[in-house]
């Protein structure tokens, strides 16, 4: 009898805890709009300004045009070059330009119309250390913005062989080998904060472009000042596709592509893995190690991509479903850009997102109303590439990076005045000595509150990581109201800045596992 009562009490206790958790999740998310509404958050305060950002670069040329014509650079007519060599009859090309790890090469380019252009390159990697290639890009002898100093170019990897099976029936993952093939890309943000390729401003007339080696050699076959294309919407995409649908013999076509069967990938760490935790992972075995998914912990940084091949039996429209799992970061979403045959078919494919969920999620690529996108494919073999992106959170993380930079400026200024351990019994009159610091703290507090609101709106809930920004916003608000708190909490202030920096790094991770992709006729 006593045992039954005790068991009943435990059950009731568990139920109470579950009810409390549900009620907590149903609480309306706190909103801070009244704290920053009507405030010019773009204002600069003396001593707390970050120069050299891409945003400031764009703003400096905000009235510039976006010319419609591409301008191809003559790779082999370079003005100056160190660590460069012209290759002939190289990898199917009559000529190509080798650039060493520490190379510097400058080209002249005549620009008919001033404005913004993307920088488009076609390149191939060469055998080296196997890490990402890095270059700095200078326009007319100057770094246009700080992040142009580290433009990243990925490599291509594949399996050296089919998986082997040991005498116990366990699959052995094949080693990774580099694939040396021509690739095309635009110069873009390696952190993923800026989704679209960088826009570079060129004056009308003669300009120079300099590429300086930072890491690893590469061979170029093309460099173009590319006109900035407006991405098409799904509606526009459909309007440009043939009107014919699938034949009656093709209406039930289904092809399942296993995640572990990816053909190529951007890093050697994106190999096939095994999962025994979920029986709906396919293929599945309780007893043996079976390679049955790809990605996961290592597929975490913007720009990393995985590509699969698939085929369709005839021209027509097809739907695509991705079976993915984001069980790595509660309160976050993991996003991917979808490329079909090397191109993003329409702007809605720039970001597909997986919310946090313990189990696999079958995500059919569809609009906001759940209507599957119809992808037009011709008969034969095609590729689908999923590239990690920060999506809508990227711009918010960039704003947090800028905020951390400004907060460190504020901290260092106060550090010079008060020392690392301020006297708790001394009134430093910081609000009188440094009124600009108080103004900067007030503005930064409001910026952080706004970022918290926008991140919560994007993810649908407040994760612990973004709560760090709220903690700092509240502390800054407290400093403005009671300046004497600055010296009392000076060490905590520095710790909170450090914690926010760590949180930004963590929020910049976008981990995702892929079990399979399913292509079906419409």
Name each model-derived stretch.
Residues 3-521:
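Extracytoplasmic
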């Amino acid at each position: 009898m006593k045992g039954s009562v005790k068991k009943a009490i435990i059950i009731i206790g568990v139920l109470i805890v579950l009810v409390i958790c549900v009620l907590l999740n149903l609480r309306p998310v706190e909103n801070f709009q009244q704290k920053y509404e009507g405030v010019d958050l773009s204002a600069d305060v003396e001593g707390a300004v970050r120069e050299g950002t891409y945003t400031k670069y764009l703003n400096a040329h905000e009235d510039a045009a976006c010319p419609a014509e591409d301008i191809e650079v003559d790779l082999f007519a370079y003005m100056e070059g160190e660590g460069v060599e012209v290759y002939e009859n190289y990898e199917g090309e009559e000529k190509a330009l080798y650039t060493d790890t520490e190379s510097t090469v400058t080209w002249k380019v005549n620009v008919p119309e001033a404005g913004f252009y993307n920088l488009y390159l076609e390149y191939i990697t060469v055998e080296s250390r196997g890490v990402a290639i890095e270059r700095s890009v200078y326009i007319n002898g100057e770094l246009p913005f700080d992040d142009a100093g580290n433009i990243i170019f990925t490599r291509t990897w594949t399996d050296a062989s089919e998986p082997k099976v040991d005498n116990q029936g366990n699959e052995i993952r094949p080693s990774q080998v580099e694939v040396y093939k021509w690739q095309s890309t635009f110069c873009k943000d390696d952190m993923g904060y800026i989704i679209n390729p960088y826009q570079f401003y060129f004056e009308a007339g003669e300009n120079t472009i300099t590429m300086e080696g930072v890491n690893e050699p590469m061979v170029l076959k093309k460099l173009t000042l590319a006109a900035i294309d407006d991405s098409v919407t799904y509606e526009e995409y459909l309007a440009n596709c043939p009107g014919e649908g699938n034949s009656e013999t093709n209406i039930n076509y289904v092809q399942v592509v296993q995640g572990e069967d990816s053909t190529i990938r951007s890093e050697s760490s994106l190999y096939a893995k095994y999962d025994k935790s979920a029986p709906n992972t396919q293929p599945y075995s309780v007893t043996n190690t079976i390679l049955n998914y790809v990605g996961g912990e290592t597929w975490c940084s913007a720009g990393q991509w995985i590509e699969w091949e698939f085929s369709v039996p005839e021209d027509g429209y097809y739907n695509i479903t991705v079976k993915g799992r984001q069980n790595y970061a509660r309160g976050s979403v993991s996003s991917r850009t979808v490329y079909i045959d090397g191109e993003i078919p329409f702007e809605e494919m720039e970001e597909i997102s997986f919310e946090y969920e313990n189990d696999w999620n079958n995500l059919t690529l569809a609009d906001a109303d759940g209507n599957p996108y119809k992808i037009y494919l011709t008969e034969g073999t095609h590729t689908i590439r999923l590239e990690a992106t920060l999506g809508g959170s990227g711009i918010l993380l960039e704003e947090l990076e800028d905020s951390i930079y400004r907060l460190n400026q504020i901290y260092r200024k106060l550090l010079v005045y008060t020392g690392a351990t301020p006297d708790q019994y001394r009134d430093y009159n910081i609000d009188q000595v440094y009124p600009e610091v108080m103004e900067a703290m007030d503005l930064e507090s409001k910026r952080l509150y706004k970022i918290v609101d926008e991140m919560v709106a994007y993810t649908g809930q407040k994760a612990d990581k973004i709560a760090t920004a709220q903690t700092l916003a509240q502390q800054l608000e407290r400093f403005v109201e009671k300046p004497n708190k600055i010296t009392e909490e000076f060490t905590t202030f520095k710790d909170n800045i450090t914690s926010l920096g760590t949180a930004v790094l963590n929020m910049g991770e976008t981990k995702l596992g892929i079990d399979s992709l399913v292509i079906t006729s419409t």
